Design a protein with these regions (language model features):
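Conserved small/polar residues in nucleotide/adenosyl-binding loops
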Residues: 228-231
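N-terminal beta-alpha lobe that positions the nucleotide/phosphoryl donor
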Residues: 1-223
Length: 231
């Protein structure tokens, strides 16, 4: 099972089967990763359709909906190779947030500041990890905002401050990518899965594999799970 689901995915499957309280989700197999590379670093239509079918299942189980302004589904997207490779590959958190879902998160938690903090972090993480927009561009804007508001720490920024930062971050994204920040969570998900697959071949992962004699051909699985701790 570990060969197909990766170490993390196999562990999650075993815990779920044992009735342990594990956040709901699904695993995209190592075979999908090797197919991604075989197809010229593209996720083919069959795998895409399969991913979206599992998203529907996750929505049904959780009662949440991707992009919903009342009860949004937010997920984490994490790598999971057969053999543990700590810190070598990429993770994306709170995927599913957009201009509608952030309002749903604010209402559901009764905490707009928390919602917009999650959103600005997601935009920055997605831009950095998925699209390789330099993280420093966002950090500069955070520092500018804190200076303008006369505060020293991120936690001192208000919900309105963070909402303004979201707009600034989305503009940075569009200026660098030549297109708006994706509002469709399904588009976000496919791009995030590609990023995790790509990270199997990043320089630090390649060095780690060589040092630990992990075959390149294994590929990595991707674990998509409900962010139960958020909403």
């Amino acid at each position: 099972m570990k060969n197909i689901l990766g170490g993390k995915g196999a562990g999650l499957a075993e815990m779920t089967a044992a009735g342990m309280p594990v956040p709901q989700g699904f695993t995209i197999t190592t075979e999908a990763c090797t197919q991604y590379y075989a197809d010229g670093r593209q996720i083919n239509d069959e795998i895409t359709a399969d991913i979206f079918e599992h998203v529907k299942g996750l929505e049904k189980i959780t009662g949440k909906t991707f992009g919903d302004n009342e009860n949004p589904l937010l997920v984490s997207v994490r790598s999971g190779a057969r053999q543990s490779m700590p810190g070598m590959m990429d993770t994306i958190l709170n995927l599913g947030l957009n201009d509608e879902a952030v309002e749903g998160l604010a209402k559901k938690t009764n905490n707009p500041r928390f919602a917009y903090d999650c959103y600005r972090r997601f935009v920055q993480m997605f831009a950095d990890v998925v699209m390789m927009v330099p993280k420093s561009l966002f950090e500069v804007e955070i520092d500018k905002m804190k200076e303008a508001k006369g505060v020293k720490n991120d936690v001192d920024l208000t919900a309105e401050d963070l909402k303004e930062l979201v707009g600034t971050f989305k503009k940075i994204y569009e200026d660098n990518e030549g297109k708006p920040f994706p509002q469709d969570p399904k588009d976000q998900l496919i791009e995030a899965v590609k990023a995790v697959f790509r990270s199997w071949d990043n320089p630090r992962a390649n060095v780690y594999r060589k040092m630990n004699e992990i075959p390149y051909e294994w590929g990595t699985a991707v674990n998509v799970q409900d962010r139960k701790s958020v909403v």
